[in-house]
Amino acid sequence: NSGSSSSGSSSSTPANAPSANVGAGGAVSAAKISGDAKKAVSNAKNGKANVNVTNAKTVGTAALNNMAKAAAKEDVALTMTAKTTDKNGVVVASLKFDATKAAEAVAKAGTKEVKLGVELNTKNTKNVTSLFKKWFKNKNIAVVKMAQKGEFGFTVEAAVKVDLKNFNKNNLKFYSYDAATNTYKEIETKYTIDAKGLVHFNTTVGNYIIITDAPIASK
């Protein structure tokens, strides 16, 4: 696992600084990710490899295409894991996806980029939590905001750190809520909860992710 630990780095670098392969505007650097991808692919295990980015906002067409090319050259399935940390550098969310599938989806949709941001415990997520508690019977609701609006166009393995106190953890339900149209739809997914309290699930859609422990029911 490359990258210096926060304890070993100089105090001038904030603990939540983006990784070295992320450019000034928060976009993944096409040149740097190309190098990272080639290195990862050459060290692939069982035909699989992964590149990490931390606190990136977007990954664009050029970066995705560079990853897809590196993967194709060695016939390796290459994933990108985009991690979001809190101010102390602790990972609170991650989005993992196949770089080639993402490159194809972005080209097909003409969107030019995938948005990688994930918000937890912000004004936005608190407003949506209040909205759902006002209109629905569900007592236990956790909300995460993905920067990606609408469909990703490919499967994303998401992990988010949410407080599941009082939730029935054996019966979690996931929904995508589109604030612009004020509509929600269920995300059909299996899920796991790891030792660090991250909830892992799959989604093909972004927007707000609503996690609850019963089917959403109107008051």
What do the predicted segments below correspond to?
Residues 1-41, 51:
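Ser/Thr/Gly/Pro-rich low-complexity, disordered linker/stalk segments of secreted
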Residues 27-173, 178, 215:
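Proteolytic processing hotspots in large secreted/extracellular or virion-associated proteins
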